[in-house]
Amino acid sequence: INNSTFENNLSGDDYINFFRSKNIVITNSIFKNVKNDAIDSDFSDLLVENTTFENIGNDGIDGSGSNVKIKSSKFYNILDKAVSAGEQSNFYLNKNLFENNEIAIVVKDDSKLISEEDILVSNRLDFVAFRKKRFFELPSADLSLTNIKNYLIEHSTKVIGLENIEYSSDIEEKLYGNIYGRASN
């Protein structure tokens, strides 16, 4: 998918959903005024590059059991999570801009995330790491090349790149529209 615009959908859950898909590449595209999730990736391999996400009602990119690379993309005014890595996903983020989002980056449920040189500006939360489903292990993240200012991190979660972490408890109770984010439909 190259040089495409996805905007103003009026109904439905995900604008695009990939299920057990390989070698998906989205470049030079725009997702704008999306009702719920812009991209949902289930058990898929996905590269998103030089793509803009703006005014998204839920998540910008939501992955479960997926391998996702996001490079040189922009996320503005995402009402829940700009990027959400869940259920044993591997996410690599590089040189993205996250601005004025509810939550910029989330890693959960035995997922691994690397963030390199991402820029975070005026997000309600820059980063969240927790275990939502207890049958998964804790997630892990390497944020050593990204400046994270505000976060929620579950105790014992392995996070490289943040010093003197102040761990939080009951993170899930603070998300999904309770304090942060948006309730799922």
Question: Predicted segment positions?
Answer:
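Extracellular beta-rich repeat passengers
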Residues: 1-185
